[in-house]
């Protein structure tokens, strides 16, 4: 089926990226000759349109004026994160928002949270979020070190979803947040991300005596209440740092949000999603070439060689699980193991039914973003059924399908917004040492 028959009207947008510890020039992807698409993502790339409106791809994905066959032949497909071509070229797809529209650190008028960027003593970039303090006593803000998600391959501390989310969290929890911009695979395979995050955490903790590099942390940070947290890959990082003997001894609590765990033997819920199952079977070895496999304790804390979770020395722990998330069953099993082995207070499990992986990062989607997401889902569904290149879909059929899909996504966004508010309520309670509602 020619993809042009039903998505030629989709929005065009600029393409560019920022990753790791630097910025590449943003460029427009050269026009590519229309040809038959084998997948929705390929269709989007051919028509200068990404999964999310104006989502960016890296500069090194742009074809040279005279591309060789190896520039377009796929070696490894890790959609929705990236694609590696036989030439070695990496094409990042980006998961949320406009990859060219990174948010500058600044005062956020809506939350009155101020942010600024800094570099640690070992060269790791971080972004610091300071809630409105007014006449607050010195060192009265609890401290959270946050690790963003993105499969260790994409995202950034300046990505709009993370910047907006952390502004909101800093304001509602009245907590000082340091978001770590760790280096990404495959350019920097694991354990580089673990090392960067550990270095950043220890750098933050050096401010506990008031003589650190950043005056905001020196003046306002309460290091009797130090927390670490992250979502997806960041949840994995949180677990691995908490297990390490190099972690500070004064961590009060950890919060794992939809943590990225996997294993050699697929769980029942994972077998029900063959697309994600195949993706994750390829992912770990790509980001960790030196790994011993999918039962590596760093990705499978439930595996046969995984150490006891009693190594986690903090006082409190909470795990968040999304009911429709591919990783949900492992998150629950991790929580069960934590309850049997953790030596601190009884760990909490917060289960959110009916929502998917890191849903809380996209609850404020614009009408344009909803339409783009609907178009993507529509393409995914259609390509499952139409394999013949000669099939042409009439515009009226396409518009009807798109309208139904858009309405469905709008309803889902309403559910996600309600669950996101519940998650925020639970996190605020956890960080402030209060009973966490709706937890088990």
Curated annotation (Swiss-Prot):
It catalyses: 6-tuliposide B = tulipalin B + D-glucose. One of its GO terms (biological process) is defense response. Residues 1-58 form a transit peptide. The active site is at 232 (acyl-ester intermediate), 325 (charge relay system), 357 (charge relay system). It comes from the Eukaryota. PROSITE patterns: LIPASE_GDXG_SER. Keywords: Amyloplast, Lyase, Plant defense, Plastid, Transit peptide. Its EC number is 4.2.99.23. It holds the Pfam family Abhydrolase_3. One of its GO terms (cellular component) is amyloplast. Expressed in the pollen grains. Optimum temperature is 30-40 degrees Celsius. GO terms for molecular function: hydrolase activity; lyase activity. It is an enzyme of class 4 (lyase). It is found in: Plastid; Plastid, Amyloplast. Not glycosylated. Inhibited by Ag(+), Cu(2+), Fe(2+), Hg(2+), V(3+) and phenylmethylsulfonyl fluoride (PMSF). Belongs to the AB hydrolase superfamily. Homodimer. Lactone-forming carboxylesterase, specifically catalyzing intramolecular transesterification, but not hydrolysis. Involved in the biosynthesis of tulipalins, defensive chemicals that show antimicrobial activities against a broad range of strains of bacteria and fungi. Substrates are 6-tuliposide B > 6-tuliposide A. This is Tuliposide B-converting enzyme 1, amyloplastic.
């Amino acid at each position: 089926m020619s993809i042009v028959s039903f998505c030629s009207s989709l929005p065009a947008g600029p393409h560019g990226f920022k990753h790791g510890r630097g910025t590449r020039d943003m460029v427009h992807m050269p026009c590519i000759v229309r040809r038959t698409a084998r997948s929705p993502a390929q269709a989007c790339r051919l028509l200068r349109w990404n999964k999310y409106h104006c989502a960016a791809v890296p500069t090194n994905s742009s074809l040279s004026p005279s591309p060789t066959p190896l520039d377009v032949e796929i070696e490894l497909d890790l959609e929705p994160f990236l694609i590696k071509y036989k030439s070695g070229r990496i094409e990042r797809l980006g998961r949320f928002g406009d990859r060219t529209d990174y948010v500058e650190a600044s005062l956020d008028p809506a939350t009155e949270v101020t942010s600024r960027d800094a570099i640690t003593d070992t060269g790791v970039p971080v972004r610091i979020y300071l809630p409105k303090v007014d006449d607050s006593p010195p060192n009265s803000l609890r401290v959270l070190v946050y690790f963003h998600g993105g499969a260790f391959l994409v995202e950034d501390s300046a990505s709009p979803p993370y910047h907006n989310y952390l502004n909101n969290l800093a304001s509602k929890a009245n907590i000082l947040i340091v978001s770590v911009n760790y280096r990404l695979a495959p350019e920097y395979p694991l354990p580089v991300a673990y090392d960067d995050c550990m270095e950043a955490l220890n750098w933050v903790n050096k401010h506990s005596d008031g003589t650190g590099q950043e005056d905001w942390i020196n003046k306002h940070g309460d290091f009797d209440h130090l927390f670490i947290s992250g979502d997806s890959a960041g949840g994995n990082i949180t677990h691995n740092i908490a297990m390490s003997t190099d972690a500070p001894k004064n961590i009060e609590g950890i919060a794992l949000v939809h943590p990225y765990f996997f294993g050699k033997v697929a769980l029942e819920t994972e077998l029900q999603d063959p697309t994600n199952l195949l993706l994750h079977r390829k992912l770990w070895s790509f980001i960790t070439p030196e790994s011993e496999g999918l039962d590596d304790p760093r990705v499978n804390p439930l595996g046969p060689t995984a150490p006891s979770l009693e190594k986690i020395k903090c006082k409190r722990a909470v795990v968040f699980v999304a009911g429709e998330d591919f990783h949900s069953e492992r998150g629950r099993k991790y929580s069960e193991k934590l309850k049997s082995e953790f030596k601190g207070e009884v760990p909490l499990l917060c289960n959110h039914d009916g929502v998917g992986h890191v849903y809380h990062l996209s609850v404020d989607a614009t009408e344009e973003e909803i339409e783009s997401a609907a178009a993507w889902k529509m393409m995914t569904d259609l390509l499952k059924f139409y394999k013949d290149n000669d099939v042409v879909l009439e515009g009226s059929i396409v518009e009807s399908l798109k309208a139904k899909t858009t309405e469905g996504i709008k309803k889902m966004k309403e559910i996600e917004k309600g669950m996101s508010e519940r998650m925020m309520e639970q996190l605020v309670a956890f960080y402030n040492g209060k009973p966490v509602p709706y937890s088990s």
